């Protein structure tokens, strides 16, 4: 079987929407594609409401596994989804 496509979810600060998409992509579709997220700017920490809700709903601790990243920190990707 070939390599899974790499999907990047992109928003401005990489603090909420794209972080949620990356976490859910890893949780729900890791057998289909590799999930990444980034922003055009970064923030010191990801959105705490997003962290709380994803942990409450899916048991995923985004704060332990994810951080705000810039576009140039990602590996080459196959698909880009903007979440502006």
Go through the PLM ranges and name each one:
Residues 1-84:
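Short polar/charged helix/loop
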């Amino acid at each position: 079987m070939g390599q899974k496509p790499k999907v990047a979810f992109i928003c401005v600060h990489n603090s909420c929407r794209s972080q949620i998409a990356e976490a859910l992509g890893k949780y729900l579709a890791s057998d289909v594609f590799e999930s990444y997220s980034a922003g055009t700017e970064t923030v010191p920490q990801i959105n705490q409401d997003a962290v709380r809700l994803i942990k409450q709903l899916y048991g995923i601790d985004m704060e332990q596994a994810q951080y705000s990243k810039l576009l140039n920190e990602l590996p080459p990707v196959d698909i880009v989804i903007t979440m502006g």
